[in-house]
Swiss-Prot record:
CDD domains: PBP2_HisGL2. This is ATP phosphoribosyltransferase. Its cofactor is Mg(2+). It is found in: Cytoplasm. GO terms for cellular component: cytoplasm. Feedback inhibited by histidine. PANTHER family: ATP PHOSPHORIBOSYLTRANSFERASE (PTHR21403:SF8), ATP PHOSPHORIBOSYLTRANSFERASE ATP-PRTASE (PTHR21403). It holds the Pfam family HisG. Its EC number is 2.4.2.17. Catalyzes the condensation of ATP and 5-phosphoribose 1-diphosphate to form N'-(5'-phosphoribosyl)-ATP (PR-ATP). Has a crucial role in the pathway because the rate of histidine biosynthesis seems to be controlled primarily by regulation of HisG enzymatic activity. InterPro entries: ATP-PRT_HisG_long (IPR020621), ATP_PRibTrfase_cat (IPR013820), ATP_PRibTrfase_CS (IPR018198), ATP_PRibTrfase_HisG (IPR001348), HisG_C (IPR013115), N-reg_PII-like_a/b (IPR011322), N-reg_PII/ATP_PRibTrfase_C (IPR015867).
Length: 299
């Protein structure tokens, strides 16, 4: 494949999505070695170049057609799209799919002593954030005026430092807020990681490679959400047992050697098999119940 047909994928150089993005691509069979001193890693087995950049640069690189694919948080994507629409710059991309990592929420938070009733409690106050566009959109929808304090990091210290009355920042567990004397009041945006593609027309070879990668990503994500279940079941309660298997479709039922009253069931479940379900299966006579993770799925 020529240099122009090499697929370029942008991922976060460091931070909460970096390792998961690399893990996903490797699970898709893309072999590469990352040198922390270099921004580009070349795949050993596919015509793919991996660009390791700042997360807030990824949407623009995809929208401008500099790279073909990007793995990015939906919050960063949405923030950049609003910014570019304001500046009349290219803001279109194709969201191929949401991924199963990078979950977070963008929330308003205030000091513990603040008497908060609803978002209107922030009327006229100063709010520190790294996401001014998402905050502005939310507050405009609520009809609330405020003053913003733009910070690139350490947003949670702004109230104690006297820079702001409240904040709008990413929250995962809330532990950082609590450590800084803040509490969460409103969720304004929920986000996961996603894969985006440039809207520029691709060559047939490059689009085929993109389709192959997306198919593999779908298989990896689906496998994570599924379990392989094996058990022995009495034939008299077979229908009840199959009905209990969460998300199972068309389980394989096999006869057991020298036992006409019991069968073996193999099934792929798209949901977790919890202890109460396993106990219910046991009460129906099921035995030798095994629940195993699945590494990859296709078809």
């Amino acid at each position: 494949m020529s240099e122009s047909n090499r697929l370029r994928i942008a991922i976060q150089k460091s931070g909460r999505l970096s390792k998961e993005s690399q893990k996903l691509l490797k699970s898709c069979g893309i072999k590469f070695n990352v040198n922390e001193q270099r921004l580009i890693a070349h795949s050993d087995n596919m015509p793919i170049d991996l660009l390791r950049v700042r997360d807030d640069d990824i949407p623009g690189l995809v929208m401008d057609g500099v790279v073909d694919l990007g793995i990015i948080g939906e919050n960063v994507l949405e923030e950049e799209q609003i910014e570019r629409q304001t500046l009349d710059k290219p803001s279109e991309c194709i969201k191929l799919r949401q991924l199963d990592f990078g979950a977070c929420r963008l929330s308003l938070a205030v000091p513990t002593e603040f008497r908060y009733q609803d978002a209107s409690s922030l009327e006229g106050l100063r709010i520190a954030t790294s996401y001014p566009n998402l905050l502005r959109r939310y507050m405009q929808e609520k009809g609330i005026s405020y003053r913003d304090c733009m910070l690139k990091g350490s947003v949670e210290v702004a109230p104690r430092a006297g820079l702001a009355d409240g904040i709008c920042d990413l929250v995962s567990t809330g532990a950082t807020l609590e450590a800084n004397g803040l509490y969460e009041t409103e969720v304004i945006y929920r986000s996961m990681a996603c894969i985006i593609q440039s809207t520029q027309e691709q060559s047939e070879a490059k689009q085929a490679l993109i389709d192959k990668i997306l198919s593999r990503v779908n298989g990896v994500v689906r496998a994570k959400e599924s379990k392989y279940i094996l058990l022995h079941a009495p034939t008299e309660t077979l229908d009840q047992i199959v009905a209990l298997l969460p998300g199972a479709e068309n389980p394989t039922v096999l006869p057991l050697n020298d036992d006409t009253n019991r069968v073996a069931i193999h099934a792929v479940s798209s949901e977790d098999l919890f202890w109460d379900t396993m106990e219910a299966l046991t009460q129906l006579g099921a035995s030798s119940i095994l629940v195993m993770p699945i590494e990859k799925m296709m078809g």
